[in-house]
């Protein structure tokens, strides 16, 4: 039985991905910083799909050492894994009101952590007897291609994740690395949690500007999950970013077109 690791899986898109893969007989390790919703999500999957389907592991991606612990937990608990889903994200805005820690955490969670997790997963698969075919899918954002002043660090990190994915097609002959880049999602980030208090207004200070631009019609979490599953199952996808738009559908980018 295949096993998938999913970061940011306690709710929203991550949980939808977990459900979609569980329906395809995957075992799931859900990781998240939410120690209430995470275990509850794992319990629900076990109730629906059978005991042993899912396990929860607390993982704060702002600390890369916790990624090592997540992979070790999965290997010890599930006997290994064949799929890594880098779904977790972190967004704070507006840009000109951010602290140094806000900026650092956005870059780490949205860019450095997926890069490091992918590297460690590939090294794990490469070290297995005769090697093992593996699959990595990262959930980036339409901000990879077009971003806004108030969320500039987030957009920069997501653009980096897309560029990393384009290059990743050459990493290993048996490992496929792809990404999905959705526009605004119906659940999305909690606007109140993402805001940093400020009395200033204007470019770089107004987090609603990108919501207006991106949120005319929002994707459903299930639509994003379906695209992730496509990346997992389609053996012909290498180093691609699937841009998801609620109106225009899916566009596949390879870094050259």
Swiss-Prot record:
Gene3D superfamilies: NAD(P)-binding Rossmann-like Domain
Residues reported to bind NADP(+): 13, 60, 87, 154, 158, 185, 187
Annotated GO MF terms: oxidoreductase activity, acting on the CH-OH group of donors, NAD or NADP as acceptor
One GO cellular component term noted in the UniProt record for this chain: cytoplasm
Active site feature: 154, 158
Pathway terms, separated by semicolons: Mycotoxin biosynthesis
Keyword tRNA processing: no
Induction section of the entry: Expression is under the control of the secondary metabolism regulator laeA. Expression up-regulated upon exposure to exogenous gliotoxin.
Job of this protein: Short chain dehydrogenase; part of the gene cluster that mediates the biosynthesis of helvolic acid, an antibacterial nortriterpenoid. Protostadienol synthase helA cyclizes (3S)-oxidosqualene to (17Z)-protosta-17(20),24-dien-3-beta-ol (protostadienol). The synthesis of protostadienol is followed by several steps of monooxygenation, dehydrogenation, and acyl transfer to yield the final helvolic acid.
Protein name: Short chain dehydrogenase helC
Organism: Aspergillus fumigatus (strain ATCC MYA-4609 / CBS 101355 / FGSC A1100 / Af293)
Gene that produces this protein: helC
């Amino acid at each position: 039985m295949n096993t998938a690791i999913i970061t940011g899986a306690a709710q929203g898109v991550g949980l939808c991905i977990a459900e979609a893969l569980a329906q395809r007989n995957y075992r799931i390790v859900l990781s998240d910083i939410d120690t209430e919703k995470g275990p509850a999500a794992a319990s629900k999957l076990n109730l629906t799909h059978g005991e042993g389907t899912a396990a929860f592991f607390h993982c704060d991606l702002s600390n890369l050492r916790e990624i090592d612990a997540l992979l070790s937990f999965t290997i010890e608990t599930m006997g290994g894994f064949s799929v890594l889903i880098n779904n977790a994200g972190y967004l704070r805005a507006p840009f000109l009101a951010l602290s140094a820690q806000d900026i650092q955490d956005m870059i780490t969670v949205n860019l450095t952590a997926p890069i490091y997790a992918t590297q460690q997963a590939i090294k794990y698969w490469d070290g297995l007897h005769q090697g093992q075919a593996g699959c990595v899918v990262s959930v980036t954002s339409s901000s990879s291609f077009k971003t806004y002043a108030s969320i500039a660090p987030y957009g920069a990190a997501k653009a980096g994740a897309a560029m990393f994915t384009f290059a990743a097609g050459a990493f290993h002959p048996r490992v496929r690395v792809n990404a999905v880049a959705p526009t605004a999602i119906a659940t999305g980030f909690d606007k109140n949690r993402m805001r940093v208090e400020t009395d200033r207004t204007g470019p770089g200070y107004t987090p609603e500007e990108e919501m207006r631009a991106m949120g005319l019609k929002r994707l459903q979490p299930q639509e994003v999950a379906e695209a992730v599953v496509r990346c997992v199952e389609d053996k012909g996808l290498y180093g691609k970013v699937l841009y998801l738009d609620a109106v225009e559908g899916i566009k596949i980018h390879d870094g050259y077109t």
